[in-house]
Design a protein with these regions (language model features):
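Phosphate-binding glycine-rich loops and adjacent basic patches that engage nucleotide phosphates
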Residues: 11-15, 33-38, 56-59, 179-190, ...
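Intrinsic disorder/low-structure terminal segments
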Residues: 16-19, 38, 62, 136, ...
């Protein structure tokens, strides 16, 4: 075909992984002999390996969730894929995926010796809906707990703010959050309106309103967390970058 009539293969609930030039090349796509297109994508702060029919139709999940994957290599003849994936309690490693079954196995263990001596922060994921907030969006949050967390104690809280504003926090091992949590801080990572991977309406909600409703989303998340008995509302900090 001459390409004049392109077909849309995914809805706006899936953000294809496009790379971040010039830091990394875009992820590969594989057009299978049976008409499937295999690609890496992101949805609600999680990475997945998807397949979509080339003639259009619903995308299906092959593998993923609860991770951030930033690379993809495909072997169509073998029916296998290899991705680089990071999990909330584990830095990135290579994982091999069977495209027919979705079964996976880890291929590398570069950080095992380090992680055996350093306990990772535990992540809790939850959502809030800001009372009276514009558009009624659910705001997804990730709270990281210090290793050895004791709910009978009281901990300072650091709010982490991502850039963009169309960036996002993922189910991933983030060094800055791990360092802060290991130092004894609770770390709150919020994806306010304007963040990617939650659909076009959510991402575009900050157009012409930077620092408006998105700021109120962040503050509502802090207000929600400081109600917990183990959070010291008098010791709050903020960390972030870019935006």
């Amino acid at each position: 075909e001459d390409g004049k009539d392109p077909r849309r293969l995914t809805g706006d609930s899936i953000k294809p992984y496009l790379g971040f030039p010039p830091v990394m090349r875009p992820a590969a796509l594989w057009w299978a002999d049976d008409g499937r297109i295999i690609f890496l994508g992101e949805r609600k702060g999680e990475s997945f390996l998807f397949q979509a029919p080339s003639e259009g139709g619903p995308s299906e999940t092959v593998w993923g969730g609860s991770c951030l994957s930033t690379g993809l290599t495909l072997d169509g003849k073998a029916g296998q894929a290899v991705v680089t994936a990071s999990f909330p309690d584990s830095p990135g490693d290579l994982h091999q995926i069977d495209l027919a079954t979705g079964a996976s196995k880890r291929l590398s263990n570069h950080n095992d010796s380090y992680m055996e001596m350093h306990t990772a922060a535990r992540m809790e994921k939850f959502s809030i809906e800001r009372p009276g907030g514009a558009s009624g969006f659910e705001i997804e949050c990730r709270l990281y707990f210090p290793p050895g967390f004791d709910a009978s104690l009281v901990y300072p809280l650091v709010l982490d703010i991502h850039g963009g504003p169309n960036g996002a926090f993922y189910d991933a091992f983030v060094p800055a959050q791990q360092v802060l949590a290991t130092a004894g801080y609770l770390v709150l990572a919020v994806n306010p309106r304007g963040s990617s991977t939650y659909g076009a309406d959510f991402m575009m909600a900050v157009l012409g309103d930077w620092g408006g409703e998105d700021y109120l989303d962040l503050m509502a998340a802090v207000d929600d967390v400081v109600q917990r008995t183990y959070v010291d509302a008098d010791r709050l900090g903020v960390h972030g970058y870019s935006y």
